[in-house]
Amino acid sequence: MRYLPLTPEDRAEMLARIGVASVDELFVDIPADKRETALPRLALHKSELEVERTLARLAGQNVPAGSVPFFVGAGAYRHHVPATVDHLIQRSEFLTSYTPYQPEIAQGTLQYLFEFQTQVAELTAMEVANASMYDGSTAAAEAVLMAHRVTRRRKAVLAGNLHPHYRSTIETVSRYAADEVVALPPAPFGEEDLITPIDDTVSCVVVQSPDVFGNLVDLKPIAEAAHKAGALLVAVFTEAVALGLIEPPGAQGADIVVGEGQSIGNALNFGGPYVGLFATRQKFVRQMPGRLAGETVDAEGRRGFVLTLSTREQHIRREKATSNICTNSGLCALAFTIHMSLLGKTGLTRLARANHAAACDLADRLAAVKGASVVNDTFFNEFTLRVPGPAADVVEKLAAKGILAGVPYSRLAPKSGLDDLILVAATETTTEDDRAAYAAALKEVL
């Protein structure tokens, strides 16, 4: 496709249409001394070899997660991904394919989406799941909007121990939808009161388990209180591996279950792309966002797969759409599906137990260090460590010793006042030597 630049007449017509007299007036918000009036003189291009060397030098400033003892979590977790996963998702049939609008030539894609949905539904103990969302936080925001549609109410209650990034995503979406959000304060040291705020004006209560501090939450009394008030319970998780060991949200009364699927089949990927999981009850399926792949038979009675539901704004009237999701996270969903298939139910449980055992061992070691304490009574593979003084300083000192010790909670919520807390994760990738090194280094810096 050729690039045809604007003519002076084209530019004048466009400026007149938006009500400005010149390009300078269009960019009046940018200080004059910050504007470039001519293209900068760029250095001559380098050879491919020189570019590779330059990028390698820059990359060398990073600390790869696998090169040091690594205990960072807070919503994204380092797990071992079998080589089979990466090998299969790089097949051109999957890597380059787009939305399967033509089922007659996209049966492979539709079938893996169907299998993905089945796995997510079984993992969460729900009746139906969609073909993925962008990530966990946007899935949570879509869940709140869905709850508003189902209940015809506009008020959501967010647990204080919901991940701050999930909270801010929900608040951003709600702000532009003119919805009300009641966000409770974080409560890392005790059980949250999530029942008192629920009344007959609330559409949903959003609860994370394991929560951002690592606590396991009993969802049953919250679900009972929500249903009694005519509201829905939206259950959130950031660590999908936990569902291999704990009671799934669907079995505890959740109406919508959303979460992050990154930790199964997907690497940390420098923060993305990730894959949002979304499951709900069958009776709410027509209010569910995204796409739904379904099983059917063709004219000759052969089994096949199609997009059963796809009520997004590209397909129907915008005001009737349940979401405006576009390409979603299909390749990440495929990676999730392959890894889950390799694990199986027994393998997932074994993986979850290994994670829990590693975290328990680490918690015991760190709690024995004078000045440090673990604030959780129950947790899966992540817990909260309380240290004297600013947690960010402790994390920096440990990093200087080659230990990536975790995430200061203040980094996620700078105004929370909880400056002495570190979120610490231990997965199957952490070794006993790693955990011993952490405890020894912590003893030195406190």
UniProtKB/Swiss-Prot annotation:
CDD domains xref list: GDC-P
Source organism, top-level taxon: Bacteria
Main enzyme class: oxidoreductase
Keywords: Oxidoreductase
UniProt-listed Enzyme Commission number(s): 1.4.4.2
Example GO biological process: nucleoside metabolic process
HAMAP family listed in its UniProt record: GcvPA
Name of the protein in its database record: Probable glycine dehydrogenase (decarboxylating) subunit 1
Organism encoding this protein: Xanthobacter autotrophicus (strain ATCC BAA-1158 / Py2)
Classification of source organism: Bacteria, Pseudomonadati, Pseudomonadota, Alphaproteobacteria, Hyphomicrobiales
